[in-house]
């Protein structure tokens, strides 16, 4: 792996590009340390970042050399995740490993922990914790408090989509990578619709640390 990473680093230097390693899941600890030492970014997903007792990890303890995001293509977008769609979908597909009620209860506890964290950290108004759109924006606002080098917002979150683009553990059971982009009401969205909608502008403002997003020169 030394030679392969060396070649990747050299080509990235020549192209003035970043390399991001997908080091989620069952990856040995030395891999993350090695990526950091060689200047390659790892991957951090908010729902997977937890402290020693399983509590939401404080922003200050997130890795610096990583690309941080709220969700990933292997999970439903934030609005779907907050609604428990990731649990119900696996149940419908017959790939849920625990009773549905237990999984939903665990998801509710996870969500409650994060809501409490967002409110305590001042990125979510207590009065808005029942509004999934406001929670989604607050989750991204939390990312800005981490030291992570690169922050990522998903297009599906920007438009309010709820459906997962990919469901691990399936082949023909789910239309992986064939889900048309839609807003939170299920209406399909074209590229022009994305630029005209309000939610993408709100999320862009959050990611830029602004109260509102400036008018784009592309519109």
Listing of model-derived features with the role each one plays in the protein:
Residues 1-219:
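Catalytic cores of glycan-processing enzymes that make or break glycosidic bonds
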């Amino acid at each position: 792996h030394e030679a392969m990473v060396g070649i990747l680093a050299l080509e990235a230097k020549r192209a003035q590009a970043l390399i991001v390693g997908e080091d989620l899941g069952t990856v040995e600890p030395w891999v993350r340390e090695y990526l950091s030492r060689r200047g390659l970014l790892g991957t951090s997903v908010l729902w997977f970042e937890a402290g020693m007792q399983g509590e939401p990890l404080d922003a200050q303890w997130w890795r610096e050399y990583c690309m941080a995001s709220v969700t990933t293509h292997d999970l439903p977008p934030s609005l779907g995740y907050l609604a428990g769609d990731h649990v119900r979908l696996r149940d419908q597909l017959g790939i849920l490993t625990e009773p549905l009620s237990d999984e939903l209860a665990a998801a509710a506890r996870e969500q409650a922990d994060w809501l409490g964290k967002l409110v305590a950290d001042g990125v979510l108004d207590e009065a808005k914790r029942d509004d999934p759109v406001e929670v989604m924006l607050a989750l991204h606002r939390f990312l800005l408090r981490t030291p992570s080098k690169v922050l990522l917002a998903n297009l599906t979150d920007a438009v309010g989509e709820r459906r997962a683009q990919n469901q691990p553990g399936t082949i023909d059971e789910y239309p992986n990578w064939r889900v048309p982009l839609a807003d939170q009401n299920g209406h399909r969205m074209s590229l022009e619709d994305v630029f005209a909608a309000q939610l993408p502008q709100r999320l862009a403002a959050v990611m830029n640390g602004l109260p509102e997003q400036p008018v784009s020169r592309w519109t």
